[in-house]
Amino acid sequence: MEDSMDMDMSPLRPQNYLFGCELKADKDYHFKVDNDENEHQLSLRTVSLGAGAKDELHIVEAEAMNYEGSPIKVTLATLKMSVQPTVSLGGFEITPPVVLRLKCGSGPVHISGQHLVAVEEDAESEDEDEEDVKLLGMSGKRSAPGGGNKVPQKKVKLDEDDEDDDEDDEDDEDDDDDDFDEEETEEKVPVKKSVRDTPAKNAQKSNQNGKDLKPSTPRSKGQESFKKQEKTPKTPKGPSSVEDIKAKMQASIEKGGSLPKVEAKFINYVKNCFRMTDQEAIQDLWQWRKSL
């Protein structure tokens, strides 16, 4: 039922930590966690007799809370050195707080397993990963074979043509200085026309060579669109409202699910599933839960 609620929220990233403890006749082990927003699970793997254990009956017991919030004791393993020195539990998961004790025997008994912590994924890191993927995709398109070398060649040839035209204009101006003032005024008019005709000549030369400057425009548009994407980061989703949470819980109950009946477990459930930290809203949800 909790898994169905988590589908609407941000994904949980599990973190695994090694766990181990030693039990003796007068030495119990208490497993507790701080009251944080993360969900903790104790997954027990193996129970085995330690070196120096006597060939006698050893009974390992675990004490935790059941679904109703009441304490319950469960026998995990029964060991004897000459018959069964070790038992594999295969991932026996318990929600803390948990007390592990040696109910019978002198020990030592070793218990190993994993401490599982469910941590919420950071929404900002996901957005950064998506932007990195888009950046790689755009850079791959720009570096297509045979496509990126055409524009620089066109620019080089156009620059050479402009330099040739500038040299011709300078030669014409030098010739005009040597002539009379009347001829100077007459010669300036065609020089200006030649300068004005330069773009047309360049366009004709580029058209004769079968080349055009238009392919350079999509690249600038792609850069502008990428800059717009960097300026508008996505905002992470906030916690759900009280009415939305009630609606989701009611829908879960109608589908056959159930809600925790103990206040402490219900509060922990609301914090983990809906990221709700407002104490007044949590109490409102608890009063609504008791009225069902």
From Swiss-Prot:
Modified positions (N6-acetyllysine) are 32, 150, 154, 211, 227-228, 248, 255, 265, 271, 290
Indicate the cross-link positions, Glycyl lysine isopeptide (Lys-Gly) (interchain with G-Cter in SUMO).
228, 261
Principal localization reads: nucleus
Recite the UniProt keywords alphabetically. Answer: Acetylation, ADP-ribosylation, Chaperone, Cytoplasm, Cytoskeleton, Disulfide bond, DNA-binding, Isopeptide bond, Nucleus, Phosphoprotein, RNA-binding, Ubl conjugation
**Domain of life assignment:** Eukaryota
Locate the cross-link: Glycyl lysine isopeptide (Lys-Gly) (interchain with G-Cter in SUMO1): 32, 246, 255, 265
Task: Please verify whether the record's keywords include Nucleus.
Answer: yes
Which sequence positions carry the modification called N6-succinyllysine? 265
* PTM comment: Acetylated at C-terminal lysine residues, thereby increasing affinity to histones. ADP-ribosylated.
For the cross-link Glycyl lysine isopeptide (Lys-Gly) (interchain with G-Cter in SUMO2), list the residue numbers.
27, 32, 141, 150, 214, 246, 248, 255, 261, 265, 271
Could you say which tissues express the protein in this record? Expressed in B-cells that have been induced to switch to various Ig isotypes.
In residue numbers, the region (Required for interaction with SENP3) covers 1-185
Where do the segments described as Necessary for interaction with APEX1 lie?
Answer: 1-117
Q: Which residues carry this modification: Phosphothreonine?
A: 75, 95, 198, 217, 232, 235, 277
Q: Extract one GO cellular component term from the record.
A: centrosome
Q: Where is this region: Interaction with NOP2?
A: 186-214
Q: List the residue ranges of the region (Disordered).
A: 138-248
Q: List-wise, which residues carry N-acetylmethionine?
A: 1
Family, per entry: Belongs to the nucleoplasmin family.
Q: Which PANTHER family match?
A: NUCLEOPHOSMIN, NUCLEOPLASMIN
Q: What does this protein do?
A: Involved in diverse cellular processes such as ribosome biogenesis, centrosome duplication, protein chaperoning, histone assembly, cell proliferation, and regulation of tumor suppressors p53/TP53 and ARF. Binds ribosome presumably to drive ribosome nuclear export. Associated with nucleolar ribonucleoprotein structures and bind single-stranded nucleic acids. Acts as a chaperonin for the core histones H3, H2B and H4. Stimulates APEX1 endonuclease activity on apurinic/apyrimidinic (AP) double-stranded DNA but inhibits APEX1 endonuclease activity on AP single-stranded RNA.
Q: What is this protein called?
A: Nucleophosmin
